[in-house]
From Swiss-Prot:
Coiled coil: none annotated. Keywords: Hydrolase, Protein phosphatase. It comes from Styela plicata. This is Tyrosine-protein phosphatase 2. Signal peptide: none annotated.
């Protein structure tokens, strides 16, 4: 879909219990989901939310040994895979129950979301 922004409006835990599965890697780590490699390259904490930069690319091809001891890739190419950068914004101040007492944190997150999505972009924002 070409999305450039993901907005997460919940925390991973609520009242000490798991609320949402972590679907993004820790800062500096990478995870493979099938043929897709996702790496969190940066995390910045703001007042009521966190911003992560996710680098997304095709996973490296598997290398295996031939019968003669040489290595072979499934796909012989020297090109580096294209990397797409996605901004992940996570609201950290939404209470476990009810609504926030102040709307300032959610509005800051909203304006940051707009900052990372160009006006001429037709790709959806994932929430």
């Amino acid at each position: 879909q070409g999305s450039k922004v993901i907005v997460m409006v919940t925390d991973l835990r609520e009242s000490g219990k798991p609320k949402c599965e972590r679907y993004f890697p820790e800062n500096g780590e990478g995870v493979e989901y099938g043929s897709i490699h996702v790496e969190t390259t940066q995390v910045t904490s703001y007042g009521g939310y966190q911003q992560r930069i996710l680098a997304v690319k095709l996973a490296e091809e598997e290398v295996y040994d031939n019968d003669d001891g040489t290595e072979q890739n499934d796909e012989q190419t020297e090109e580096e895979p294209e990397v797409r950068y996605i901004t992940h914004l996570q609201c950290k101040r939404w209470p476990d129950h009810g609504v926030p007492k102040s709307t300032s944190a959610i509005f800051r997150l909203y304006y940051k979301m707009l900052e990372y999505r160009p006006r001429d972009c037709e790709a959806p924002i994932l929430v």
